[in-house]
From Swiss-Prot:
It comes from Paraburkholderia xenovorans (strain LB400). The gene is lipB. Gene3D superfamilies: Bira Bifunctional Protein, Domain 2 (3.30.930.10). Keywords: Acyltransferase, Cytoplasm, Transferase. GO terms for cellular component: cytoplasm. In the reaction, the free carboxyl group of octanoic acid is attached via an amide linkage to the epsilon-amino group of a specific lysine residue of lipoyl domains of lipoate-dependent enzymes. This is Octanoyltransferase. It is found in: Cytoplasm. The record marks 156 as: Lowers pKa of active site Cys. SUPFAM superfamilies: Class II aaRS and biotin synthetases. It comes from the Bacteria. Belongs to the LipB family.
Length: 241
């Protein structure tokens, strides 16, 4: 947890973010790791962004309704977690960013954090000539009407869910890059029946996971603290093609 500092010199609010590339990792491993990271925090612990890609998995938020899983025999595991929100899907071709932040140190309210995360998604999409927009009361980012949207205006392209514990955040945001979208048909995405889910590839973007992940990381960092991330070099094989 975010404990009382041992030393009288905690990190300043402007301490740089550290970026961790975790590669392809089972969801449960990421979930356990971010909880452990948050539980072990002190006032001196630097904030981090983790970028990861998961094998197929459905996750259900702490107040989620299992009835939103429409096909229990899909063969895809369901993991109940402690974030906000309903049910969503993670799978190959999706960039997931986990945001491990000390909100008190950053003097951030939860609503402002959500707004900054959403803006980072919008900025990332704009880098590939796509337009994203918010919807009131429905966290996440949706495809805005326009030439690039085609028939997919209003479709959800990024999902967001957070947990705040002792003033620190974990969980985060997922951006659909180039996925098999069929598993989304087995759920009511984020609890909305009939909501279309789309990815960047469907909208004509040819960039791969690595390229989009780097752009997304830069946009998240810029929106969170306005400075470049302290980037940990990925290990061999840590980034997917």
């Amino acid at each position: 947890m975010c404990a009382t500092p041992v030393s009288p010199t905690p990190l300043p609010a402007t301490a740089p973010l550290a970026l961790r590339w975790r590669g392809t990792e089972p969801y449960e491993a990421s979930f356990e790791a971010m909880r452990a990271f948050t539980d072990g925090r002190t006032a001196e612990t630097p904030d981090e962004i983790w970028l990861v890609e998961h094998p197929p998995v459905f996750t259900l938020g702490q107040a989620g309704d299992p009835a939103h899983l429409l096909a229990a025999d899909s063969g895809i595991p369901l993991v109940k977690v402690d974030r906000g929100g309903q049910i969503t899907y993670h799978g190959p071709g999706q960039v997931v960013a986990y945001l491990l932040l000390d909100l008190r140190r950053r003097k951030l309210m939860v609503r402002e954090l959500v707004t900054r995360i959403e803006q980072a998604v919008i900025d990332t999409l704009a880098a590939y000539n796509l337009a994203g927009e918010r919807k009131a009361g429905a966290p996440g980012i949706y495809v805005a009407p326009g030439p690039a949207a085609g028939s997919h205006a209003g479709a959800k392209i990024a999902a967001l869910g957070l947990k705040i514990r002792n003033g620190c955040s974990y969980h985060g945001v997922s951006l659909n890059v180039n996925m098999d979208l069929r598993p989304f048909l087995a759920i009511n995405p984020c609890g909305y029946a009939g909501l279309e889910t789309v990815d960047m590839a469907t909208l004509g973007v040819t960039a791969g996971w690595n390229d989009v992940a780097r752009t997304f990381a830069a946009c998240l960092t810029a929106n969170l603290d306005g400075s470049p991330a302290a980037v940990a070099q990925p290990q061999a094989g840590a980034l997917t093609a």
